[in-house]
A protein has these predicted regions:
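Glycan-recognition and catalytic regions of carbohydrate-active enzymes
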Residues: 129-176, 180, 212-216
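Acidic/polar loop patches that form or flank catalytic/metal-binding clefts of enzymes
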Residues: 23-30, 53-57, 123-137, 151-155, ...
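Catalytic domains of carbohydrate-active enzymes that cleave complex glycans
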Residues: 103, 112-124, 128-131
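Carbohydrate-binding surface patches
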Residues: 161-201, 241-242
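Solvent-exposed beta-strand/loop surfaces of large extracellular or lumenal domains
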Residues: 204-228
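Conserved, mostly hydrophobic/aromatic
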Residues: 26, 119, 177, 238
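C-terminal beta-strand-rich structural cap/linker in extracellular carbohydrate-active enzymes
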Residues: 222-246
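Aromatic- and carboxylate-enriched substrate-binding clefts and catalytic-loop regions
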Residues: 1-105
Length: 246
């Protein structure tokens, strides 16, 4: 399906129609970017059409997935849902990544992987790593498992294509905020003025003190925020943060 010619496009539409007939959902992985099919067939939940995380199983270190990630919200994501397959628990800081098909790793930090579930729109999300790795990481796994896949409201709080982005999304009364950076470490200020007029409890996953050399390093903390709060968060090179507010 890795093509976008007339025959393949026609096949995708036939598959969507057949799945709708039998009340099945469809994830078109290995296909081209969406162009409105999910409006005609709402049972089509996701499309790949992206150089997703699976590429890290075989891509050389010269492939800069971190830079690519901060391009996607401004380019590919505009066309519709994206089956990027995030969620790696083996995370390599700059200079430590190498391709490994049997035990693949992501470029960048653990918190970057958590943030991608918020930054990228993906109504049919997945966990890309092995069950044993998730069992070893109950804090990260538990946080990912709670993140909704569809949203009532989305706001881009800050960003610059190819450098960084911070996105807030609401499901019901719960907000999630995710931020990622390129290989440049940076300090982000999250303006919480999008919140209502009360005090909220928040869970924050952010890059640990050693995340610049050990991508798995993170810090988890509970904070209280209001709509006049401005959270200052440091992002390691290739880093990120994920925040749940309720």
């Amino acid at each position: 399906m890795d093509r976008d010619d007339q025959l393949m496009t026609a096949f995708n539409y036939r598959a969507a129609e057949m799945c709708a007939k039998y009340k099945l959902i469809l994830d078109l992985h290995g296909t081209h970017k969406p162009a409105g099919m999910n409006r005609t067939y709402p049972n089509v939940l996701n499309f790949e059409g992206v150089n997703g995380l699976e590429q890290m199983k075989w891509s050389p270190a010269s492939v800069d997935q971190v830079k690519y990630d901060v391009m996607l919200p401004f380019t590919r994501q505009v066309s519709g849902p994206m089956d990027y397959t995030q969620g790696a628990m083996r995370n390599a800081s700059k200079g430590n990544y190498y391709p490994c098909n049997s035990e693949p790793m992501s470029q960048g930090t653990r918190c970057r992987q958590l943030a991608l579930y918020v930054v990228f729109e993906s109504p049919f999300n997945m966990l890309c790593d092995t069950p044993s790795n998730y069992m070893r990481e109950p804090e990260s796994t538990g946080f990912i498992a709670e993140i909704p896949t569809v949203w009532d409201e989305s706001i881009v709080l800050d960003g610059k294509m190819g450098e960084y982005i911070v996105t807030a999304r609401r499901s019901g009364n719960v907000w999630y905020v995710g931020g990622i950076t390129d290989w440049t470490a940076r300090d982000i200020e999250v303006d919480c003025s999008f919140l209502g007029d009360k005090t909220y409890d928040a869970t924050l996953f952010k890059d640990g003190a050693n995340a610049h050399r050990a991508g798995r390093d993170y810090k988890w903390e509970s904070v209280r925020v209001k709509n006049d709060s401005k959270l200052k968060i440091h992002l390691a090179p290739g880093g990120g943060f994920a925040l749940k507010i309720k």
